[in-house]
A protein has these predicted regions:
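C-terminal output helix
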Residues: 88, 106-115
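Receiver (REC) domain active-site loop signature in two-component systems and cognate sites
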Residues: 57
Length: 120
């Protein structure tokens, strides 16, 4: 079964970078959202197998979107990404139910390792 992944980042180049990493490694069912608001509505409609989400975004932050997605679906699998490697953000995201936290800049192997650990 082709796992469905939602990429959420306000930076189009970052979504493209992650998408390219995933598609070249067999993950081809990928949806995208440019902010937390779109992420919540897309997750609600699509119930993806995994969400990879930035923290700092306009309209609705990744933390706010994480709260809403987990309230809607407590079993949702969410991995947070951020350039801010701040311990408080990591702790908050994990407390809210994020399965992992990836600090940017990251290597492609880190994304793949995390996705495989969660989906395979």
């Amino acid at each position: 079964m082709d796992k469905k992944i939602l990429l959420v980042d306000d930076a189009a180049f970052m979504r493209m970078l992650i998408r390219n990493t995933l598609t070249t490694n067999g993950y081809t069912n990928i949806l995208e959202a440019a902010d937390g608001e779109i992420a919540v509505s897309t997750y609600s409609a699509e119930k993806t197998d995994l969400v990879i989400m930035d923290i700092t975004m306009p309209n609705k932050t990744g933390i706010e979107a994480l709260k809403e997605i987990k309230a809607m679906d407590p079993g949702a699998k969410v991995v947070m990404c951020s350039a801010m490697g701040q311990e408080a953000m990591v702790v908050e995201a994990i407390k809210l139910g994020a399965l992992d936290f990836i600090v940017k800049p990251f290597k492609a192997e880190r994304i793949l390792q995390t996705v495989k650990k969660i989906l395979d």
